[in-house]
A protein has these predicted regions:
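Generic structural signal for helix capping and beta-alpha/helix-loop junctions
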Residues: 44, 97, 119-121, 154, ...
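Gly/Ser-rich helix-loop-strand patches that form or flank binding pockets
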Residues: 25-28, 99-152, 236-278
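A short acidic, glycine-rich active-site loop
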Residues: 56-70
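Structural beta-alpha unit
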Residues: 1, 78-110, 211-244, 250-255, ...
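Small/aliphatic-rich secondary-structure junction motif
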Residues: 1-56, 139, 151-152, 156-221
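Aromatic/hydrophobic pocket-lining residues that form π-stacking "cages" and hydrophobic walls in ligand
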Residues: 23, 76, 100, 205, ...
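Short, flexible loop segments at the rims of nucleotide/cofactor-binding pockets, characterized by
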Residues: 12, 87-91, 120-125, 165-166, ...
Length: 278
């Protein structure tokens, strides 16, 4: 398996450039095509206007959306052409989760942005992106690579941390990330919890991964009262990982939020790219 078809999400977001560069890096490594999928936001009507919506307001927002689309198109096409990779432009008026879900099912991996966990103005979050990484991972049937909402994003895949708990979601993530794992300098296989249980969980999967020629280091992390997601991100930083691979747990983002899920913790505190799979 390899990544030969990559979809990158583009929207009203200054982080488009970071996602495009990450997609180009993967395309060069795997000989892939990159599809830039731009999702057109609907008019944003303030709630206090009720049913009365001035035509001028709608037209202004449509004009701004058109300008943003042209800007994103120019940036994507020129950057990919300059990099010499195969690429194409796609546009959709569907909500981001729906548009990406339909597109990525005929692709290998989707690259999306992490929503800002602490926006100064919640209305500034691009339409539909506040739930994007987690919901897409649960629905798409393909791996989803989430890019942090700030900070530099270097080339990924040299030092990878795999979060392992022996469950179906983690198994799916492990195999969906195999193209990256095979070319990594080091793979850190990490489980969080009691040592005895951790050793049992790591033993069989370690042997399996070594059969794929992976260079492995294993670790059992004591959360010491922290959330599991917080402990995993701390371990990733400690080991200078440039990518975290994990299962997208839960049946919905709401359920994850209610029960304080690992996925939600990771997505709200991530400082490096995270590959999610379900």
């Amino acid at each position: 398996m390899s990544y030969r078809d990559i979809v990158v999400h583009l929207t009203l977001d200054p982080r488009n450039a970071a996602r495009i560069q990450l997609a180009i890096g993967l395309a060069r490594r795997f000989g892939a095509r990159v599809s830039g999928l731009y999702t057109v936001p609907p008019p944003n009507v303030p709630y206090y206007m009720g049913e009365y919506i001035p035509t001028e307001l709608i037209q202004k927002q449509m004009d701004e959306a058109q300008k943003a689309s042209v800007s994103a198109h120019t940036e994507f096409m020129s950057t990919c052409a300059g990099a010499g990779i195969e690429h194409r432009w796609l546009s959709s008026e569907l909500a981001p989760v729906e548009a990406l879900r339909l597109t990525v099912r005929a692709s290998d991996i989707a690259i999306v942005g992490q929503p800002d966990p602490n926006p100064a103005d919640p209305s500034s979050i691009p339409y539909g992106t506040d739930v994007l990484p987690h919901e897409l991972a649960l629905q798409a049937g393909r791996p989803v690579l989430a890019v942090p909402h700030n900070g530099p994003v270097a080339e990924i895949g040299r030092r990878i941390l795999v979060a392992w708990n022996g469950k179906r979601e983690a198994t799916r993530a492990l195999h969906d990330a195999m193209p990256l794992l095979r070319s990594a300098e080091t793979v850190h296989l990490v489980t969080v919890g009691p040592e005895r249980k951790g050793r049992t969980m790591l033993a069989e999967v370690t042997e399996h991964m070594q059969r794929h020629g992976l260079r492995l280091e294993t670790a059992i992390v004591d959360p010491a009262g922290q959330k599991v997601g917080t402990a995993l991100m701390a371990e990733a930083q400690k080991r200078q990982a440039d990518l975290v691979v994990m299962g997208a747990f839960g049946h919905s983002r709401l359920r994850e939020m209610v029960f304080g899920g690992v996925t939600e913790t990771i997505l709200s505190s991530m400082s490096l790219p995270v590959l999610l799979s379900n």
